[in-house]
């Protein structure tokens, strides 16, 4: 049995703009989550071509310990809280698989994303068979809704309801911003359709851990896209060449950060 949810994130930017914004924000967010022996290590970041699909392949290792809840820490063997993330970014489609060497086939997280130029109204964009699609829970994430943000995660300078872009004049996003966006031909629009499939096979803990991970994915997607929008003035003028250069610099910086200082960024303490 697996748990599947589809998260839909609408944004006031174009699919083309988002490609740069997403990569910029991933690099920045990685630095905020790395330090004190924990965080993200980039092993590979290179172009790939397979079965007619072209894109960028990344292989990252997530070193976690304090970032998981106590009930997981208590049962996890020493050194087991290390996760491998492999991603194939054939934009506007992207596929990410997270695995753990200790749990082998008993655990995976699969995130498949389609980026579409609409307001999140398309059904079954991932082309699942009808029986599987019936079991999928659809979750709408509103980046301007503060009630969807954990109190510990809230930052006023990363709040789309308060932020206005100097370069694009987009924002602040009011309570009816999606309706206004639908009626505004001058402002681009898009939706990230993120299909998350989770398998965790461990007797007595399966549904607790699967639900915990889905809750964390929603938290990550919410915080990440709030940041992405509020950082728009930092990335809107960048090219893909700028991004690749920045990724190379970030890879070196992450190695330094991980080996020094204190643990940084998101903790699962509030979810225990």
From Swiss-Prot:
Keyword terms, alphabetized: Acetylation, Endoplasmic reticulum, Golgi apparatus, Lipid transport, Lipid-binding, Membrane, Transport
A GO BP entry: retrograde vesicle-mediated transport, Golgi to endoplasmic reticulum
Q: Which GO terms describe its cellular component?
A: endoplasmic reticulum membrane; Golgi apparatus; Golgi membrane
Compartments reported by the entry: Golgi apparatus; Golgi apparatus membrane; Endoplasmic reticulum membrane
Source domain of life is: Eukaryota
Instruction: List GO molecular-function terms, semicolon-separated.
Output: phosphatidylcholine binding; phosphatidylcholine transporter activity; phosphatidylinositol binding; phosphatidylinositol transfer activity; sphingomyelin transfer activity
Q: Which residues carry this modification: N6-acetyllysine?
A: 215
User: What protein name does the entry list?
Assistant: Phosphatidylinositol transfer protein beta isoform
